[in-house]
Design a protein with these regions (language model features):
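An active-site-proximal structural segment forming one wall of the substrate-binding cleft
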Residues: 1
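Acidic/hydrophobic-patterned starts of short beta strands in beta-sheet-rich repeat architectures
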Residues: 4-5
Length: 181
């Protein structure tokens, strides 16, 4: 069995009851223990909770939003919806796909082997903007001076974990060195 089965994104053009009935079948068959959502808006999470209740099935137990110092949008409605409905929050990418490690300098070409240096579209279309890189460098300096040498990636992860709505984070290191750091 799977402990947690995630619905990774919303269903355009699909009735909400259909995927929830499929999840209920998996739950009843013992193939999954719990289910959760990733990348859903707060109103949609609330709708899922209510629909699950109408179907007499368990609701989601966990939500996996993209949340970090550079992307605080989940604070607008997702975190509140999760708290209201008793859903655990386990954000992914607390260091913004590496930008909040401080390894990317504004105006500089990213090093080969890095996510941005490899041309990963997810980072290049989202976090890899001059203003985000400048914010990361300012935070890096702050951590080195004011926080007595705390690494920016540790500070950024601790910042996410300091939110009362957050249960844990998904760190997502790309290399063993990043994991041991």
């Amino acid at each position: 069995h799977l402990d947690v089965y995630y619905l990774h994104r919303d269903f355009d053009g699909t009735r909400l009851e259909d995927p929830l009935r499929a999840l209920d079948d998996l739950l009843r068959a013992g193939k999954i223990r719990y289910w959760g959502v990733s990348n859903f808006r707060g109103w949609r999470i609330a709708e899922m909770v209510h629909t699950a209740r109408q179907l007499n099935m368990p609701g989601p137990v966990v939500c996996q939003p993209y949340y970090n110092l550079l992307n605080r949008l989940p604070e607008v409605e997702v975190l509140e919806a999760c708290c209201h409905h008793g859903i655990g929050v386990v954000p992914y990418s607390p260091i913004a796909r590496g930008v909040l490690s401080g390894k990317y300098a504004p105006g500089a070409k990213p090093a080969e082997g890095t996510r941005a240096g490899r041309g990963d579209k997810r980072i290049l279309q989202t976090e890899f903007r001059e203003e985000s890189l400048a914010i990361a460098q300012t935070l890096k300096t702050h951590c080195e001076v004011k926080k007595k040498g705390v690494a920016l990636q540790h500070f950024a992860t601790a910042w996410v974990l300091a939110n009362k709505a957050v249960s844990a984070v998904i760190a997502g290191p790309r290399t063993l060195d990043q994991w041991t750091d």
